[in-house]
Regions:
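Acidic, glycine-rich segments characteristic of secretory precursors and extracytoplasmic regions
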Residues: 19-68, 460-472
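Elongated scaffold/linker segments in the mid-to-C-terminal portions of large proteins
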Residues: 83-84, 97, 234-371, 426-472
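Short, surface-exposed recognition loops and adjoining beta-strand edges that mediate ligand/DNA contacts
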Residues: 32-34, 62-81, 195-281, 392-398
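Conserved, well-structured interaction surfaces
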Residues: 45, 82-152, 191-196, 345-350, ...
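Inward-facing hydrophobic residues that define packing positions of alpha-helical scaffold repeats
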Residues: 48, 110-113, 179, 186, ...
Length: 472
C-alpha cells in the first residue's frame, strides 16, 4: 500500500493536511513529494530513517524548541524581542502563536509512528530482527512525544492509530492512561531493540531504559525508577557493568562523550558571516561577535543559582556578552564548538539523554525509599564532577530533595525542558514562580499546564480546555 511522504534528503516528514484531522500541519515548503511504499525494504528503511530527521532535526519542538520555548516557560531564559514576552511572563492563552508548535510537533511524531507500525505489521520484506529494530524505534518516538505532551498539557488525546476517523474526534485521556501507554511502548521497545547494535545517535534499548527510568520517577514508582537507572549506571567505580561514564564538563556535549545515552548529530550552519560552521543550536543562541546584545539570555535567578558556588565548573556552561551601555548578557554556552566533522573530538552532538540524569533519578527515588546513603552517594557523583565538595547538609528527606532539585537545576538548565517539568511534578512551581521577579505578576497555579490550542478546540468538539483558560 502506497502513501504520500515528504522526502528530506534520505528521510521523510509525514504530511498531515486533512482539516478533519486532530492535526493540521503543512509540509515544509522545500519538500519533494514522492511515493514511498512499505512493500519494499528500501521504503521501510527510508521511513525509519525519517523518524530521526522529523524528530531531532526538523521538529519545531524537539530540536531547539524545548530550549527556545520551555526554557522561557520556567525561570531560565528571556528573549530580548517582545515576540516571546508572553512565554517568559507566563501570560499565554489558547490563541498564542507558539502554543500550536508544542502540540502539533509531538502529534506529528505520533501520527508517523502509528502509520509506520500499522503498515509494517506482518511485513515479510525485511529480516525480523531488522524490522523489530524499526518497530522499537517507532515505539520510542511515540512514547517520547507523549511524555512531553502529558507534561505540557496534562490530559491529552491518546492515539494509537493513524485513522483520521478516530483521531479527528478523540477525547482527552487521563494522564494516568497516557503514562500507561508510554510505559507499555517503552517496555516493548526495550525488547524489540535488544541486541540491535544501535549507536548513541540511534535509538537503543539503553535509550528506552533511560526514558523509562524518568517516567517511573515522574509517576512516583520509586523501586522501578531505581531498577531502570541501575541498568545504566556503573556498578562500581570505574564503570564495570556500564557502557557510560560521567565526562569532564568540557566534554559532556561532544560527539565522543561517554556520558551520552542518546544524541542527534547536528548540522553546521552553512550561511555567511561569523556563524559559519557553528552547530545549529549554537547558531541560534550564541551572540554574533559584533552584536551589542544577546537575543536570548539567562535570567538573574538562574545565573545566581549556578554561580552560588564560584568553583562550580558548570559555570562554564554560561557565556557572557557585554552589550551596549555595559549591560552583561548571560547566554547558553553548552553548545559552543565549531562543527568540525573531520575532527570528531571537538564535534558536538545534540544530547537528548545522558548518564548524569540517571544518577539524579536514582538519588531522588532513593530518598523516597529511605535509602539515604545511596542518595547521598549519587548526589556526590554529580557534585564531584562539578568540582564541588561532598554534600554536607542535612540528610532529612526534605533537605535531600531540595539538594537534588538544586543539582538538577544546575546540571540540566537549558536542556530538554527539565526545569519546567521538575517544578511541576514536585508541586514546587507556585512557590518558585510567585517569587521570580519577572513572573510573579502574571503567575497563577493553572498556568503550570499550557492551554489547548484554540484551533484544536474548534476542530474537535470532544476536546475541552484546561481550567483557567476558558475566558482567555
Amino acid at each position: 500500500m502506497k502513501h504520500k511522504y515528504i522526502v528530506l534528503s534520505l528521510s521523510i516528514t509525514i504530511s498531515l493536511c486533512s482539516c478533519e484531522s486532530i492535526l493540521d500541519i503543512d509540509p515544509p515548503t522545500d519538500s519533494i513529494t514522492a511515493d514511498v511504499t512499505f512493500s519494499t525494504s528500501e521504503g521501510i528503511r527510508t521511513a525509519a530513517t525519517g523518524f530521526y530527521t522529523d524528530n531531532f532535526l526538523n521538529n519545531l519542538m524537539y530540536y531547539q524548541g524545548l530550549e527556545l520555548y520551555v526554557s522561557q516557560l520556567c525561570d531560565e531564559m528571556l528573549a530580548r524581542s517582545g515576540q516571546f514576552a508572553d512565554l517568559s511572563q507566563n501570560n499565554y492563552n489558547a490563541s498564542s502563536s507558539y502554543i500550536p508548535n508544542l502540540w502539533d510537533a509531538p502529534y506529528s511524531s505520533i501520527y508517523g509512528a502509528n502509520d509506520f507500525l500499522e503498515h509494517v505489521e506482518g511485513s515479510m520484506v525485511l529480516p525480523e530482527s531488522e524490522l523489530n529494530k524499526y518497530r522499537g524505534e517507532a515505539l520510542f518516538f511515540r512514547a517520547y512525544a507523549y511524555f512531553y505532551l502529558v507534561n505540557l498539557f496534562g490530559d491529552v488525546p491518546l492515539l494509537t492509530t493513524s485513522d483520521v476517523n478516530v483521531t479527528a474526534k478523540a477525547p482527552r485521556a487521563s494522564k494516568t492512561e497516557v503514562y500507561q501507554q508510554i510505559v507499555s511502548d517503552l517496555l516493548q521497545a526495550q525488547v524489540l531493540l535488544k541486541n540491535s547494535g544501535n549507536g548513541r545517535t540511534r535509538i537503543s534499548t539503553d535509550a528506552a531504559t533511560a526514558l523509562l527510568a524518568r517516567v517511573y520517577l515522574y509517576t512516583e514508582q520509586w523501586d522501578k525508577a531505581v531498577s531502570e537507572a541501575n541498568k545504566l549506571l556503573p556498578t562500581i567505580d570505574g564503570g564495570l557493568g556500564s557502557n557510560y561514564l560521567l565526562e569532564a564538563i568540557d566534554r559532556v556535549f561532544l560527539s565522543t562523550s561517554s556520558e551520552t545515552i542518546l544524541a542527534s548529530n547536528q548540522e553546521g550552519f552553512t550561511g555567511t558571516g561569523s556563524y559559519v560552521g557553528y552547530t545549529r543550536i549554537g547558531n541560534l543562541f550564541i551572540p554574533n561577535e559584533r552584536a551589542t546584545y544577546a537575543s536570548y539570555y539567562f535570567c538573574d535567578e538562574l545565573v545566581n543559582a549556578v554561580r552560588a558556588e564560584p568553583e562550580d565548573l558548570r559555570n562554564k556552561w554560561i557565556g557572557e556578552k557585554k552589550g551596549s551601555g555595559g549591560k552583561i548578557y548571560y547566554f547558553p554556552y553548552k553548545y559552543r564548538n565549531m562543527m568540525t566533522p573531520n575532527n570528531a573530538a571537538s564535534y558536538e552532538s545534540y544530547v537528548i539523554l545522558r548518564l548524569a540524569e540517571q544518577y539524579l533519578i536514582r538519588a531522588e527515588a532513593s530518598v523516597h525509599l529511605g535509602h539515604t546513603q545511596q542518595a547521598v552517594n549519587d548526589i556526590n557523583k554529580i557534585r564531584e564532577r562539578a568540582a564541588l565538595s561532598p554534600y554536607g547538609g542535612s540528610t532529612a528527606k526534605d533537605d535531600l530533595l531540595m539538594e537534588i532539585e538544586t543539582q538538577r537545576r544546575k546540571e540540566f538548565f537549558f536542556e530538554q525542558g527539565h526545569r519546567w517539568m521538575d517544578l511541576n511534578r514536585t508541586g514546587r512551581a507556585d512557590a518558585v514562580y510567585s517569587k521570580t521577579s519577572y513572573k510573579k505578576v502574571n503567575w497563577k497555579a493553572f498556568r503550570s499546564l499550557l492551554p489547548i490550542p484554540e484551533q484544536q478546540i474548534g476542530r474537535n468538539r470532544s476536546l475541552t480546555q484546561n481550567p483557567g483558560y476558558e475566558s482567555y
